[in-house]
């Protein structure tokens, strides 16, 4: 049983993109390569328990075990030493990636307060899209009662598109609600 969005990509989105950008081959159509979820937990320096909670929440959201990220350099003003654990990240690929995107677009984003669509200016010039989420409570897996602190996370959607225009069209076809 492959993911719903993956089937939609193969049957509907690919032909639409080939027609719009007049690719000579179906293999030229941009596709989503991976989705990276990153949660920076700066306060883990003073309280390591915060990092454990963030790792657990990220695991619930993504459905796989997060990787704990460590500080590359020491920064005295932040009381940070090199090698200290200061965040967590997850890289989603394949069916899990499509299922997460489906859940993000259809369930989580509509739950954001005062939501008018995601910014269309968050492309990086290489066809990748970055989205910041202010609170982890928009995800259905997170139980409101078990949350001690509201944390945000970054969601990076890496595509094989060469331009931002192609990438935006790809994400629009998937149903990403861009603010005009």
Curated annotation (Swiss-Prot):
One of its GO terms (biological process) is translation. One of its GO terms (cellular component) is ribosome. The keyword Iron does not apply. SUPFAM superfamilies: RL5-like (SSF55282). Keywords: Ribonucleoprotein, Ribosomal protein, RNA-binding, rRNA-binding, tRNA-binding. GO terms for molecular function: rRNA binding; structural constituent of ribosome; tRNA binding. The keyword tRNA-binding applies. HAMAP family: Ribosomal_uL5_B. Part of the 50S ribosomal subunit; part of the 5S rRNA/L5/L18/L25 subcomplex. Contacts the 5S rRNA and the P site tRNA. Forms a bridge to the 30S subunit in the 70S ribosome. PANTHER family: 60S RIBOSOMAL PROTEIN L11-RELATED. This is one of the proteins that bind and probably mediate the attachment of the 5S RNA into the large ribosomal subunit, where it forms part of the central protuberance. In the 70S ribosome it contacts protein S13 of the 30S subunit (bridge B1b), connecting the 2 subunits; this bridge is implicated in subunit movement. Contacts the P site tRNA; the 5S rRNA and some of its associated proteins might help stabilize positioning of ribosome-bound tRNAs. Belongs to the universal ribosomal protein uL5 family. This is Large ribosomal subunit protein uL5. It comes from Levilactobacillus brevis (strain ATCC 367 / BCRC 12310 / CIP 105137 / JCM 1170 / LMG 11437 / NCIMB 947 / NCTC 947) (Lactobacillus brevis). The gene is rplE.
